[in-house]
Regions:
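Small-residue (GG/TT-enriched) beta-loop-alpha framework at ligand/catalytic clefts
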Residues: 3-18, 34, 52-53, 114-220, ...
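N-terminal phosphate-binding loop and adjacent alpha-helix
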Residues: 25-51
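Short glycine-rich phosphate-binding loop at a beta-alpha junction
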Residues: 52-65, 143-146, 251, 255-269
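Primarily periplasmic coiled-coil/stalk helices
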Residues: 187-194, 198-236, 240-243, 352, ...
Length: 407
């Protein structure tokens, strides 16, 4: 049984969800939203309230940059990696970026427009921002640092025969294009829920109240406006921003050669009632739905809408439980974490990973200080021994060479 605490951080809001995985079953142990002013204090509070002191944590990065590179599908893996590095360095020169200040990752997909090429989704983040995240979670089991636009598909129930957009309206809006069930493209918009909340907050002087106002607001399509019984004083803040977002989504759809069958809406703005119908009208009838985590069903205790509010955090928790893209983690693990992974790996021969196969298992508490001391001591002792043997071999080789020369 493994658990992961997903924490999604925006400028004023933190969303969190702790997910436990047992075999193929997923369970939400705890979730919630907090408006914060002191980030470190709020993180400590969430870890304490969810009893996640020993659980791994998965968080988002912000303001990451996306670039798209197109390569021949005939390149070897080694040549492809070199070509991607060279292309990105050229982009940095063109855009006047310092490549040494950036940490980058990439994913490879088939180019839908040219079958002889592959498309590289290249993601770069400022190293200073990554280091700040590491500092914010110092002393905690931070496992994953991942772009939210690439983790949000983790919770979608995708259809191999459909192409979809996931419009995640958090502080800023990300648009993730899925071809079948695979990520194909990401577009970030400058407009998002932050504009709505900031404008309401300026009037109410409470970010929490601004969020609650959005939850209690219903917007209507042109046909349903007559059903609105009273004027909502806050629609003037909400509707214009949603209109801007919807039109930019429409532009993305129009510019793509891929036919979009469905649009999923999620994020902070998804708490606004009827937002899916509003978008569907503006997107000329393309089916729009609120994104629901694939493994969660309505219950008498908790309404599924409560889970939907923390979709971003749930997707991050799933990322920490090894769902989604495996090579998008911006967290560089230290030596101890790598050793723990190695010691905890399934090395059973003759069975699939994760299967019990009736064999005995050894349970080692890798967080024990004594175990750490023992492992690290023997680890470095082994390195020292190998180094001594290597030097001895070199001395013997030189001695043997001189002996042959004298003879």
């Amino acid at each position: 049984m493994a658990s992961c605490l997903g924490i999604y951080i925006d400028s004023n809001i933190i969303k969190y969800a702790k997910i436990t995985k047992e075999k193929d079953d997923l369970k939400v142990d705890a979730f919630g939203i907090k408006i914060y002013s002191d980030l470190l204090q709020t993180i400590d509070q969430i870890v304490s309230e969810t009893f996640s002191f020993k659980d791994q944590i998965s968080v988002n990065i912000t303001d990451e940059m996306y670039d798209y590179l197109y390569m021949s599908d005939l390149l070897s893996k080694k040549d492809l990696a070199k070509a991607i590095e060279t292309e990105f360095e050229s982009l940095c020169v063109e855009k006047q970026y310092n490549p040494n200040a950036l940490e980058s990752r990439y994913a490879i997909v088939n180019d839908q427009n040219d079958k002889t090429k592959i498309k590289v989704i290249h993601v770069a983040e400022n190293k200073m921002k990554i280091n700040q995240i590491l500092q914010n979670f110092d002393g905690k089991r931070l496992q994953n640092i991942t772009p939210i636009a690439l983790t949000i598909p983790n919770i979608a129930q995708t259809n191999e025969k459909e192409n979809a957009l996931i419009v995640n309206i958090e502080d800023k809006t990300s648009i993730t294009t899925l071809v079948g069930s695979k990520i194909y493209d990401v577009q970030n918009l400058d407009v998002g829920a932050q504009q709505i909340l900031d404008e309401i907050n300026a009037k109410e002087n409470s970010y929490l109240k601004a969020y609650e106002i959005c939850k209690n607001t219903t917007i209507y399509t042109m046909e349903g406006q007559g059903l609105q019984q009273q004027e909502n004083d806050y629609l003037g803040y909400i509707v214009p921003n949603l209109f801007t977002i919807a039109n930019q989504v429409k532009d993305v759809i129009g510019a793509s050669l891929i036919k979009i069958n469905k649009v999923y809406i999620t994020g902070t703005a998804s708490v606004i009632n009827n937002i899916d119908l509003y978008f569907e009208e503006l997107l000329d009838g393309i089916k729009c739905e609120i994104l629901k985590p694939f493994f969660i069903e309505d219950s008498q205790k908790i309404n599924i809408k409560d889970y939907i509010e923390v979709n971003s955090a749930i997707s991050l928790a799933l990322q920490g439980l090894e769902y989604g893209l495996a090579n998008m983690n911006f967290n560089k693990k230290n030596t101890w974490e790598q050793l723990k992974e190695t010691l905890g790996s399934d090395i059973t021969i003759g069975g699939k990973k994760g299967k019990d196969n009736g064999k005995k298992k050894i349970n080692i508490n890798l967080n024990s200080p004594k175990v750490k001391q023992w492992v690290m001591r023997d680890f470095f002792r082994s390195i020292s021994t190998i180094s001594c043997l290597w030097r001895a071999c070199n001395v013997y080789r030189l001695w043997n060479a001189r002996k042959r020369k004298r003879n």
